[in-house]
């Protein structure tokens, strides 16, 4: 629900007390010429928390310490966190470099760098190391005195040289080795021990994380209060202040009571002509879930009706139709219940996580219901006579259509009988519907009529959902756009007329029993009446410029046809699921299970992407076009954040 917001002027003396009290109420956003910027303390605390969270990721849950080892003031704690981060980063980089050095000098073997230095001092002979490219079959030893073969590694031959020898620089390359591999490994062990010690200290500091959260919360509260106080203008040598603010209308009585207690004068003022009035949404339950979806795309304008519930229910229907699989719905439902149980502590501290799991659970339930209505379960081919199919929505509608075909014998019936002569013998709707035959180029017997009817029904349901969805949006916004009523009438008329034009049978004929010819004739005239009403509404609202409303007929048609994506995406997912099951039957059970798991995992991921993207797109693009202004900004009232140590910031 969108709550109105009005602009008020506040004048009084008790400045600090007034703003502190307003913060407790949380019903006023004060207007300020400057944007709220984080103070140095807030930035430092935020950075400290980020660093601590990043560092503690390397700690296992068992290593995290929950008991404090002593008292630390916030400044000391932050400084130690930053120092540890720097030291751990330095040690990690040193270990990486040391590891590369060990790999480089490993072929030289174990030696003492100290003994080599003593040998050089006593004899004046330098000990050097060289390497050359290894040639298969070539002798490893070199016919030079004081040149000793050490090893072959990495496709190179390594040598030690004592004193001065004449070796070709084109073949041999000197390698610097100030320390041997055993000395490097000794240093590596020392650094690793030091790194473990630093990480252990990080695990101990995890016990102070709640203190940092509380300190950050307090600083944010203090910062927002100071910013609000700065927005006020001081008058009469700072004895009186004045401030402008947006007040939530439903909370106006609380604000007036506060002002009376502090002797503050308040007066409603008109917003500036170019001023954007903030939008305040207040939703609970399913409306709160819808509000989360609405905020993904745009903020409603202050003149918009709150679309939260509409968007949620529409998204629920679209997502269920796109997934179109009861098995996948059970997976979503089971996963959401499992995560809700495992993350029950986090749910208490995170509203976003709680809403996400609730939405996931509801969407899973919707997928189960729609998948059951269309007899779709993990892509498994269900028998035409299965009870699971007989009690489904699509089977019921298909029987109704078959009954209509046998009774009225429309053009579609004649075409089917021509293509499949066996249908002439069928007298009952069920026999006609389940008659099996082979398609051209196919040797498998299938209930061809049944499959055709189901495809047509699902496609028409998608279009019908589009007409209903757009009509609801237009009617919801008809006070702001008079032509909307005409377009609703036009869509209803077009829906009745087009089956006649296409010589097809529609749901309205066999399910709603609307006469075929009469319904088409009425629809033809209703469509033109609706077009005229739309143009008339545009002229009444916008004068002669409203005549361009006739061009919107293309937009309306394209928007309705856009809902065919519901059918197309569901069909694609069903085909992939069925293909996975067919492929798994060609292999052994072990391989088949792997194919099923992998194939359905990929299909679920793609289906979720399609359901989310296109389910939201139909709301935000097609539906918003007729029932939403947008371009608003959310109201951010001065409000005290409750500083609880268990609060997830």
Swiss-Prot record:
It is a multi-pass membrane protein. Keywords: Cell membrane, Hydrogen ion transport, Ion transport, Membrane, Transmembrane, Transmembrane helix, Transport. GO terms for molecular function: ATPase binding; proton-transporting ATPase activity, rotational mechanism. One of its GO terms (cellular component) is plasma membrane. Coiled coil: none annotated. The keyword Mitochondrion does not apply. Its main location: membrane. Produces ATP from ADP in the presence of a proton gradient across the membrane. This is V-type ATP synthase subunit I. It comes from Chlamydia trachomatis serovar D (strain ATCC VR-885 / DSM 19411 / UW-3/Cx). The lineage of its organism: Bacteria, Pseudomonadati, Chlamydiota, Chlamydiia, Chlamydiales.
